């Protein structure tokens, strides 16, 4: 047993130290890769009663030390593993993989118990014996399958199949009135322990199905199975159909809620965009208004220019003193209609009064 454990440790070390891509190992965080092999198993494992055995050659069991060192190719170590293998799952496959890799040269024989033995000692199975045989046959680690395997291994059975070691997990298996059906195998030094895979078993799978029975029953009714095939009563069938309709309505309501939320979100985004655009346009409008009507706006400049032109029109600038003076011709007297009085002549005093009135008007406009 010590040699076996040391061989397993060494094999694990070799796997860890094997270089991966770019010389990296598993310790570097990069899993090592193996070469792709196109050669694989093309046929299922044969049954034991279909294999010709040469009983003329004597059968001599190998020891644990010899098995760990390695045996010749023509004499592999014959390891036997048995079980029910109902609803064949990854836990079964891993157990058989461990049994296959116990020794460098291993021939794995797997025994599958019949329906009669299983129903008597363990309970009812989901799959019948033929389905369980077929499932084990197609496991890649299996070299031979024994149908109708015994519940307790006898010396005659071990000798008939020339078994060197029996592989199973080390947990005592109490059944058939015995605390451990593998106790005599352990005492004989023929027991090779394997590790049970936690979190997966046939009982766990059945528990999941029973826990969610209504879900799976409704699912199969939708897929065309009848209530009779599912062993479902008439009332439960109608209940499942009603639940299915309710679930569809709930789904539609949920879809509508999600779509309405998306619509509201889009409206909020659009409203935010509109508000931002409105603020920008308002700023532009206010800026344009101030440019036109503000204290320094264009309108004030226009009024100033108009006022200046009006002042120039009312009181034109006098010509410089250097220029020759021109005498004005006396303006003709204006006669008011229906009166014999003439219009008063423009005097310097009247011109000064007119200028004073114009200045007052301009000051009022500036205020």
UniProtKB/Swiss-Prot annotation:
Residues 319-348 are annotated as: 3 X repeats. It is an enzyme of class 2 (transferase). Keywords: Acetylation, Cytoplasm, Endoplasmic reticulum, Lipid biosynthesis, Lipid metabolism, Membrane, Nucleotidyltransferase, Nucleus, Phospholipid biosynthesis, Phospholipid metabolism, Phosphoprotein, Repeat, Transferase, Ubl conjugation. Residues 272-293 are annotated as: Autoinhibitory (AI). Residues 315-324 have a biased composition (Polar residues). Its EC number is 2.7.7.15. GO terms for biological process: B cell proliferation; CDP-choline pathway; isotype switching; phosphatidylcholine biosynthetic process. The keyword NAD does not apply. PANTHER family: CHOLINE-PHOSPHATE CYTIDYLYLTRANSFERASE A (PTHR10739:SF19), CYTIDYLYLTRANSFERASE (PTHR10739). This is Choline-phosphate cytidylyltransferase A. The gene is Pcyt1a.
């Amino acid at each position: 047993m010590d040699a076996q454990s040391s061989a397993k440790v060494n094999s694990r070390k070799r796997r860890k130290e094997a270089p991966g891509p770019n010389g990296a190992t598993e310790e570097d965080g990069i899993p090592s890769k193996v070469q792709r092999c196109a050669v694989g198993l093309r046929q299922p494992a044969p049954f034991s009663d279909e294999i010709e055995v040469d009983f003329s050659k004597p059968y001599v069991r190998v020891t644990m030390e010899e098995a760990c060192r390695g045996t010749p190719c023509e004499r592999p170590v014959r390891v036997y593993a048995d079980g029910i293998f109902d609803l064949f799952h990854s836990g079964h496959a891993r157990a058989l993989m461990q049994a296959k890799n116990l020794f460098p040269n291993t021939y794995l024989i797997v025994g599958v118990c019949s329906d009669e033995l299983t129903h008597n000692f363990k309970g009812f199975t989901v799959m019948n014996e033929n389905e369980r045989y077929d499932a084990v046959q197609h496991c890649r680690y299996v070299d031979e399958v024994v149908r109708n395997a015994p519940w307790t291994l006898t010396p005659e059975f071990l000798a008939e199949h020339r078994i060197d070691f029996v592989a199973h997990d080390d947990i005592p298996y109490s059944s058939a009135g015995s605390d451990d059906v593998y106790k005599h195998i352990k005492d004989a030094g023929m027991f090779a322990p394997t590790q049970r895979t936690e979190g997966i078993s046939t009982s766990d799978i059945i528990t999941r199905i029973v826990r969610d029975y209504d879900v799976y029953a409704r699912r199969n009714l939708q897929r065309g199975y009848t209530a009779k095939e599912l062993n479902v009563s008439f009332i439960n069938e109608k209940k499942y159909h009603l639940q299915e309709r309710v679930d569809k309505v709930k789904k539609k309501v949920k879809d509508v809620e999600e779509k309405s939320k998306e619509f509201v979100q889009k409206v909020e985004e659009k409203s935010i965009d509109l508000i931002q655009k409105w603020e920008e346009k308002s700023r532009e409008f206010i800026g344009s208004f101030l440019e036109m009507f503000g204290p320094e706006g264009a309108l004030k400049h226009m009024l100033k220019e108009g006022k200046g032109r009006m002042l120039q029109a009312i009181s034109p600038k006098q010509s410089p003193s250097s220029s020759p003076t021109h005498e004005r011709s006396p303006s003709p007297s204006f006669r008011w209609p229906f009166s014999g009085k003439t219009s008063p002549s423009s005097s310097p005093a009247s011109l000064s009064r007119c200028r004073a009135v114009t200045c007052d008007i301009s000051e009022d406009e500036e205020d």
